[in-house]
Amino acid sequence: MYDLVIIGSGPAGLSAALGAARNGLDYTVLERSSIADTIYRFPTAKTLFSTGNELELMPGTFPRGFKPTREGLLSHYLKTARDERLRILTGVNVRRIMAEGDSFRVQSVECEFRSRAVLVATGGFGKQRMLSVPGESDDRVSYNFQEPYRFALKQVLVVGGGNSAAEAALDLSDLAARVTLSVRRAKLDLPPSAPGGAPIKPWVLEPLWGAIREDKIKLIPSSRVLEITPSSAILALDTGSNGAAEEEIECDHILALIGADPDTTLLSEAGAVIANDGRPVYDPETYETTVPGLFVAGHVTRERHIKKAIHVGRRVIETSVMPMLERCSV
């Protein structure tokens, strides 16, 4: 029986694994895809918003003073996992967590693991948000953007009002024949906290406005997709006092970069209470859910930043899991 099973090998899971290893725990990490898969799914050559010291798994192991790229951060995480000999099993799709007395059974498609404690660090992107409109299909719509070259000389509709959509529109603006950006908000130049404001970083918003002014990107605010046809998308427009209107946008492809939500199925089926915001109920000090011995960390919680995910992953081991295991062994 393991002391701890960690589900997920993103920044929080890797940080927790380091903490478990350094505290002498018998642990394993179960990952259904690849190590740091969330980072892997970032756009190619993307520069992150945080600096190296905010993203490193161990202090002093990542160059300081600059913001790393996707590739640089992936290399750092993979190198750390290799050098520290972290016990990570990839390709293990966990289907169920069952509490049995003072231990857990963690079941995957192929096998079963027994553990005294479980830490779920499966990230915040388990359930992709969909447009949910007629005509939506994989042929017409993509929900993840990695590089612009497949869309060269094509007409692309980007849907979304956040950083991902804004950056994708910018990346496409020099290659695509036409880029249209559809956002639900009325204005992009308001702060995120303001009604109708967009959560776009200032250093992304400035070049976005430049591309809009140069007619490289057509912005359609106060809009949402109503229907998708084989060659276009029908947008509903909120025209204020004039009521609603519709506009047809010709497009070869649609990028719906409208976010995702955590998949809390494992937690809820294990008996953990899920709050109205779709995230688990947990003690903000220990990160223990309503099921004793079942912990959470990373973006599946309400901590949305990588820096915080790394800190919490390590902290859960030292201040929550270790004391619990020591109490149980007395």
Model-derived features with residue positions:
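FAD-site-proximal beta/loop scaffold in flavoenzymes
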Residues: 136-150, 260-305
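Beta1/beta-strand and adjacent pyrophosphate-binding region of the FAD-binding site
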Residues: 1-12, 154-162
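A conserved FAD-binding loop/helix module that cradles the flavin
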Residues: 196, 297-330
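Rossmann-like NAD(P)H-binding beta-loop-alpha module
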Residues: 154-177
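A Rossmann-like FAD-binding core segment of flavoenzymes
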Residues: 75, 83-106, 113, 176-277, ...
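Residue-level detector of alpha-helix initiation sites
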Residues: 10-11, 34, 163, 301
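Short hydrophobic core segments
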Residues: 5-7, 112-125, 157-159, 250-259
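Beta1-alpha1 glycine-rich phosphate/pyrophosphate-binding loop at the start
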Residues: 11-86, 169-200, 274-277
